[in-house]
Structure formats: C-alpha cells, structure tokens
From Swiss-Prot:
Its EC number is 2.1.1.33. The active site is at 143. The gene is trmB. Keywords: Methyltransferase, S-adenosyl-L-methionine, Transferase, tRNA processing. This is tRNA (guanine-N(7)-)-methyltransferase. GO terms for molecular function: tRNA (guanine(46)-N7)-methyltransferase activity. S-adenosyl-L-methionine binds at residues 68, 93, 120, 143. NCBIfam families: tRNA (guanosine(46)-N7)-methyltransferase TrmB.
Amino acid sequence: MSDVTTAEFNEEGKYLRKVRSFVLREGRLTKGQAAAMEQHWPAMGLDYSPEPLDLKEVFGRDADTVLEIGFGMGASLVEMAKASPELNFIGIEVHKPGVGACLSVAGEAGVTNLRVFHHDAIEVLENSIVKGSLARVQLFFPDPWHKKRHHKRRIVQSEFAQLIRNTLKIGGVFHLATDWENYSEHMLEVMGAAEGYKNQSLTGDVVERPDHRPLTKFEARGHRLGHGVWDIMFERID
C-alpha cells in the first residue's frame, strides 16, 4: 500500500495541494535498490517534466499504454508488464525504495515495456500525460484513511476522477481495488456520480478480480483470513 499524496479535498472534491507525505517518510535504499536505480533508471526511469510525454518516443513503438498510480514495491506491476508484452506500462511511485525495488525486479525479469516515475502522481497526470492517450489507469490499494475525519484525504474524489478521465481514451478503463469495504463504497459513490464514465459491473457495483491484476501475497493472506478485496472498473464513455 502506498500514499501518492496527502493532499486534501474540499466538500466538492476539489483538489487542494498540501505538503506531501513522502517528504516525511522517504526511506533509505538498500544496496540492491541503489544498484538497480543506477543500472536501470537510464532505460526505465522517466524524469518528471511539465511537458507531455511522447509515448511513441518513450517506448519506441505504438501500443496501448497502462498507467499505475502508487505501485508500492512494484512486484505486481512487473508481473503485469511481463505477462502482457504487447502493452506499454508506466508506473508512478513517490517512495524511492519502492522505485528501486521495482527496477530491480524489472531488470531481473528482463521486461522492456515498463517505465517509471519517481514523482507525485497528481503532477504527472496533470502535466506529463497526453489527454486521451491511456488504455487503462490502475489504482490498487490506496491509503484508505479509515478514520471518518480523514476521508477528505482519500485520493479518490470527484476532481481526481475527472483528471483520470482526461488521460483515458474513449473506451479506456479506470480500475480501482481496495481491501477496505468502506473505501469501496466511497469509490463507487464518487465514480458513479462522475461524468463521462460507465460502471463495467453488470450489477452496478464491484467486479471479480480480472486476470490482468495479479493476486498479491498480502491479498492471498487476506483471503485465507476471510478478508475481502473489492475491484471496481469504470469505462470512459465520453
């Protein structure tokens, strides 16, 4: 689980920039992570720029692109990239050891269709991603901010939903997953009210975990203990 930002939102879901949590909790890299950063960042790292990325130039090809917000240590993101070599993958993570771990695993796996940002997701989405360019955006297990007084810090808010919508192609999908039922209800409420989206669930709520999202060790342990995980997928229709 990883924080992307501690930004708060007002009652209308308006994004308000705040001091970001990763400045306070930046951890030290292990020797392996530091070595992976040095070895693999030149090929897989994306330096933040307020200018939109040319995805064809970045990946050297035209292909559908999947972006994941807050990939943690990156194991599942690398697994997805390896399983779908026909797709391009971009990951965003503010926790530097996570970026180093992801690059280490990606290097060992030999994936060539993955690029990563070590930066704030909101700024990347606002400035670095061409509008209407993504086939899928993934937000898996964001901080649930489970105390009610902290709900306004949850990243899934109305303005955020529209920010994601702007990056998606028509027909592109915003895929969310959480292991907090209350947050899944919040996600469904926000996304259900968001303009330009359609829930892919035939029952209007959650979907079964799709094959493209790997089962994490944490999630598998939760299943054994009877804990739930909720997958939510909304398609951009307008």
